[in-house]
């Protein structure tokens, strides 16, 4: 076999530019993204995109053997950008020839194609950022590219090794996720290979997958033949949803369960496919996502690629069978897992696969089709097909296959009972098999149910478990704090709830409160004896004492923690830190060894142990150990620092800097460890040698100097912040910033940390100090405004603060947007809001979301022509899940201008505008969803036809206007029917003479409004996508009231109750003058009353 080749090169790829990172912190406490919290802190977001395309150079790393060739882009999250099947001369993963980001990612920019690795949540926060990488050669001729990062949102580390072996036609992916924190964390892992969509695509799910779930298991469908309603699509006729062409709307589905280790996709057009193989006990997740085979999906295809067409996301979950589905990672725990991605050909739909082979056994009109595809050499193997329960084989052939080759055949003229196919190795061991699956008429599994609200819980056990779920899944609308606090309200000494609260308080740097909760937990744990099974409360209290410099108390609790198995490793590590701080290196080495016996993968302890060997003069032992550690952890920046520190060679310095590439997280991790080990002088030396010129490392470096010597570093830290926006999120960063009391920007960053952790009083104190020290700093005033509105509900105070901010930064489009948003949420008149935006029109037009507000304000103030100009010329970039904001204004604009022509007795011109409203212009970057009934457009088309004397066309249009769903949802999303559609349905029914049906519809609307107005509403527990980047929050209950009023208003109009209509409209307008389609109804309702009633 030819050895695997690996090389690095710069590749030029056509690339669309993004806008700059937003320098403002985003506190998104209510944002929902992919079914969990859409919070973006500590990152800066990028929410503006460009149509400018340039040929950009990217760092690429290639792997190639005789069968496949793979390109990895470390500068784009370490994704596999291209995977080429050399045998079939095809991309076995969808290849996008351009880098064309759309607003799909957690932080904004996201690109399609290749294989993305989504962790620690979906989509990967750093999917559009550089990560670390290095290369490793193996003695057998294999090559590995390691990519990874320390991710600052959750404080976890990942290493992923991409390996090609000389004798294997598969990409082997070995990953390690590590938690280097003192408290547990949570992560998800969904590898996300894209495959070619189109008419020829078919997903290859295992034969035992008979049901699939939606996100959060909130809905379920039969599979592969769907027979019910799924994603609002009627599949009752029986539709094969494994085919791309049969799924018309954006749709996710995830296998309920499977006992097989594979999932894949087949392209009928290319006679080739992709398979993923992994242990299903570790990797149960099998998912398909598509944008939908429709105008809607095609619009997203155009937003993501120039010429490569539609794609499917074939996702594979590790420790996860659904999204969101996070798994726990204990303090200092490491999880390892392997996955294989491989091309295959010839066999089509297959029934089982392993890391060595793929088998097919399928009945068709031709007979019994069988096949075998080799991933690795199959020498001396046998393939047998038998009827279960019978001895004689229908097929029993010797097999000799090289990788990437296949054999197949057909058994004719027989119709046996259940069959099995078996592949055996040279020793007769069955290595892969499949028994024909016999479908059974089983009921669909139940969908998930939302848990009780915290105040309704009566059991501490239930309170703790729900709190754990919310914490684990990063739930967007409910807080685990509420459930743990409910638990301690029921039982003040409940061990688990107090322990959970202690850990949460520790994570947000409230160490005294962490001690208090841990002490409460220990009152129960130590009530009968001092040696409980669980030592976690002692461990977290010790860590909290240590953070406060109370080392004697910390030592006592660390010793108590080592008595218990689940806290022994952490306890000995704590003792090792204290020993190192005191210069007692021999004791520190012993404690490290004790800790490693309990947890041998704790990279913190491994690094400390190696450093203590160096400091105690045992350099030879340190070097031997470090060589092994660097083979195990080739991306650990602290190990590479140790490699330089031990010898101070220029080559070692270049290696260390080459790995870190100036990324702040690497500098912060190593410096933070050294500070925690009581070695601030080494930390300062390390930061000086690495020379990372980003804000937080510069602050950390400054904090280690005397106050009189750090002015230059502090000034530089402030100056470079906009170049790479990152806010503090670790305890070491907080401690450093708190020590630099003379810096106003450090006060701001501390306020950001505490506000994000929901320690609002601390945050406000820091922002107030910030603006006292630097009253010209806009973001300090913005922070105070956010708190004033969201937490104090004080419009006047928030407005004054935001006015200060915008006056200080009049070119800042986000500040203008938020000032307008504040007016919108407080019910300001359209005229007042429009005056502000038009006075700053150039700034307002910098943002799509603010432009959408402008469009609505122009409509409300009778200036539809101004809105039409923008809608005809501006290129918009919607967020995934936030579609409809601009297209709704486009439809409204067409309706308003059509009405103007109707009112001027120009029905033909009106008809043309209405017809155009049925198709969105390409510059809006959105397509229509199938099933969109457009009742308003068809109603007015009928009015136009009637005005032109075409009663046949009028009736046809009325029939269309009268169709559609007649339900009203409490929560509304982009794919939900607007509530006013029901009104137009009822109006159409009236004009068709179906008065009784219309009367019933309007009566049901009125009843719904009356009943729901009495209902208290809460956020949708299973919401999947609410992507708006809004730091100022609306009142959910008021929004519900507005919806009820609008439904009541339209119901009254439909029933001819003019007084009730006017009353509801006045009340609605008083609380929200910009209610949906107010411009239309205010204009046309006199005509409606005259025409219909």
UniProtKB/Swiss-Prot annotation:
Any Pfam family matching the protein: TPR_16
Superkingdom per UniProt: Bacteria
GO molecular function: carbohydrate binding
InterPro entries: DUF5107, GH-type_carb-bd, TPR-like_helical_dom_sf, TPR_rpt
Chain segments annotated as coiled-coil in the UniProt record: none
PANTHER family: CELL DIVISION CYCLE 16,23,27, CELL DIVISION CYCLE PROTEIN 27 HOMOLOG
Name under which the protein is recorded: Uncharacterized protein YphG
Species of provenance: Escherichia coli (strain K12)
Lineage: Bacteria, Pseudomonadati, Pseudomonadota, Gammaproteobacteria, Enterobacterales
Protein's gene: yphG
